[in-house]
Amino acid sequence: MSREPVPSSFDEGNPQFTEETGMQKFTRRLKEEPLVPLGCAATCYALYRAYRSMKSGDSVEMNRMFRARIYAQAFTLVALVAGGMYFKTERQQRREFDQAVELRKKQEKRDAWLRELEIRDKEDREWRERHAAIEAAAKEAGNKAAPRKEPEAARSSIEPADEKSIGVMDAVRALISRN
């Protein structure tokens, strides 16, 4: 089993769960309705020319540019409405596609989360089994290491006082009690 961390479905930077950036969306919208930015640019240009005319004191040119600004804004609105009517079915399809993509992303995220939970559960079970085996081996080793009662004839010639577990006072008492 590899020691790499399990990829989380909650990672925001995961490219698997990203769809369209803001710039991509802007360029797509610009391609869908190219007349709207053109109308906005014409409006800005008319306002700029009206400002320059006002600074120079030419009121006739300024009024003409303000009228041009109104025409440019009307053009922008007409382009927006016409584009909305023209791309209505395409936008509806796009909306359905976006909903399907969102549903797919949610399902993928849920599936990734479930896989992650299954992997973590499997690791947890393996860890418990390993530790249960280690504990069983330790108990078995503890049972083997426990001293067995040997018959008196099989005892070694070591005096009870010579055993390491008995202290000096206990050894003296044992010698006195024997006599």
Curated annotation (Swiss-Prot):
Keywords: Coiled coil, Membrane, Mitochondrion, Transmembrane, Transmembrane helix. The chain crosses the membrane at residues 34-50, 70-87. Residues 136-162 are annotated as: Disordered. It is found in: Mitochondrion membrane. The keyword Transmembrane applies. The keyword Coiled coil applies. Pfam families: HIG_1_N. One of its GO terms (cellular component) is mitochondrial membrane. PROSITE patterns: HIG1. It comes from the Eukaryota. It is a multi-pass membrane protein. Residues 7-98 form the HIG1 domain. Residues 136-153 have a biased composition (Basic and acidic residues). Gene3D superfamilies: 6.10.140.1320. Belongs to the RCF1 family. Associates with the respiratory chain complex III/complex IV supercomplex. Cytochrome c oxidase subunit which plays a role in assembly of respiratory supercomplexes. This is Respiratory supercomplex factor 1, mitochondrial. The gene is rcf1.
